[in-house]
Swiss-Prot record:
Primary location recorded for the protein, binned into one broad class: other
Keywords, alphabetical: Coiled coil, Endosome, Protein transport, Transport
Region named Disordered: 193-215
Family recorded in the similarity comment: Belongs to the SNF7 family.
Lineage of producing organism: Eukaryota, Viridiplantae, Streptophyta, Embryophyta, Tracheophyta
Gene3D superfamilies per the UniProt record, alphabetical: 6.10.140.1230
Biological role stated in the UniProt entry: Component of the ESCRT-III complex, which is required for multivesicular bodies (MVBs) formation and sorting of endosomal cargo proteins into MVBs. The ESCRT-III complex is probably involved in the concentration of MVB cargo.
Protein known as: Vacuolar protein sorting-associated protein 24 homolog 1
Residue runs in coiled coils: 15-60
UniProt-listed Pfam families: Snf7
Assembly, per entry: Component of the endosomal sorting required for transport complex III (ESCRT-III), composed at least of VPS2, VPS20, VPS24 and VPS32. Interacts with SKD1.
Biased composition regions of type Acidic residues, renumbered to the chain: 206-215
Gene giving rise to this polypeptide: VPS24-1
Length: 229
């Protein structure tokens, strides 16, 4: 009975499918733009916190916050890439519909399939693109495929070194001379030595202040994680 109903059921209009898909793609692009704005807004707050930490010579907090900014900016770059790929999907779908007017049906598009596959690897886009892939497979625009995980792992040491360089650039750009005046060895030493090892009364006071700083740092990290996800 189901096969009979499928035969009787008219094929969806390519133009209508295109309108529906492009509407969904535009909505996803707007969601990405909103997420980027939220991340950049939160980054401005983090920049203020970095300046305050640098003024009190708390380079542990300043560097940790700078690392969060580096991570956020990388997320923003990935979001812009996702948006660009969705715009490309919309463009290629328009071309497929134009061809369908001539041949009478939607043809498979290797480029759309490639773009959908790429976006399915992005955590923020995986669920949405899974739904898109089902609809497009059903309409004959792409072939059914299994999204295999691809190992894009880079050498951890090279990656860490690259991140450290970016962190230093962010610190210099935001904290300016305050961060630049501190020797590299001193900056690294401040990161390595735990606050609880302090023995003098002055250092003990710094530890007490550090507790509040750590709580503030965790709050900032939580807010950034929320807008990045």
């Amino acid at each position: 009975m189901e096969r009979v109903m499928n035969i009787i059921k008219p094929k969806p209009d390519p133009k209508q499918l295109l309108r529906d898909w492009q509407r969904k793609l535009r909505q996803e692009c707007r969601n990405i733009e909103r997420q980027i704005r939220d991340i950049q807004k939160e980054e401005r707050n983090v920049q203020k916190a970095i300046k305050e930490a640098a003024k009190r010579n708390d380079m542990v907090s300043a560097k940790a916050l700078a690392k969060e900014i580096v991570s956020s900016r990388r997320t923003v770059n990935r979001l812009y890439e996702n948006k660009a790929q969705m715009n490309s999907i919309s463009m290629h779908l328009g071309e497929s519909v134009a061809i369908a007017r001539t041949v009478g049906h939607l043809s498979k598009s290797a480029e759309v399939m490639k773009l959908v596959n790429n976006l399915m690897k992005a955590p923020q886009m995986a669920a949405t693109m899974q739904e898109f892939s089902k609809e497009m497979t059903k309409a004959g625009v792409i072939e059914e495929f299994v999204n295999e995980a691809i190992d894009n792992a880079l050498d951890s040491e090279d990656m860490e070194e690259e991140i450290d360089e970016e962190v230093d650039k962010v610190l210099t750009a935001i904290a300016g001379e305050t961060a630049a005046e501190l020797p590299v060895a001193v900056r690294k030493e401040r990161i390595k030595v735990p606050a609880q090892k302090a023995s003098t009364s002055r250092e003990e006071e710094a530890v007490a202040e550090g507790v509040d700083d750590e709580e503030e740092l965790e709050e900032i990290r939580a807010r950034l994680a929320k807008v990045r996800s």
